[in-house]
Amino acid sequence: MYPATTPYETASGVGVAPVAGLFPVAGEAREWSSRLLDCFDDFDICCMTFWCPCITFGRTAEIVDHGMTSCGTSAALFALIQWLSGSQCTWAFSCTYRTRLRAQHGLPEAPCADFLVHLCCLHCALCQEYRELKARGYEPVLGWEFNAQRAAAGVAMCPPASQGMGR
């Protein structure tokens, strides 16, 4: 009666069916692929996050949001909150994405509550979340659309919506 998989809606409005391995499977219990303090495991991301945490956050947020908000929008909002609060309130915004990432991939709330991780170790948390997406097959630097298209290779996509009458 209902399809076995629910397509993810992309920013362009094209539905993409989840593909095993890339998109999460509900109910699977998993562990984080790296620890919170393993920042130097990916030195490029470590440096990017140290100098421009808004970019790391924006890339992660675009994937977690399934492309509903762009990297640029999320990064700009993060930077604005950081600037207005003097870097004191970004954790309150960014920890919500850690919670969503954990829910999507069945990850434990470890090593402590999401808000504490972001309050005490914001840069380490952003690096861990980015590394987690990479470990699960995403390429955050390329954005949601690319990742969704790559996952849909060989998978039937929904036909485009009717454009109506036109010349």
From Swiss-Prot:
Keyword Nucleotide-binding: no
Keywords assigned: Membrane, Transmembrane, Transmembrane helix
UniProt main location, coarse: membrane
Key word Lipid metabolism present: no
Subcellular location: Membrane
Transmembrane segments: 67-84
Protein's membrane topology: Single-pass membrane protein
Pfam families: PLAC8
Protein name (database record): Cell number regulator 3
Organism from which the protein derives: Zea mays (Maize)
Source taxonomy: Eukaryota, Viridiplantae, Streptophyta, Embryophyta, Tracheophyta
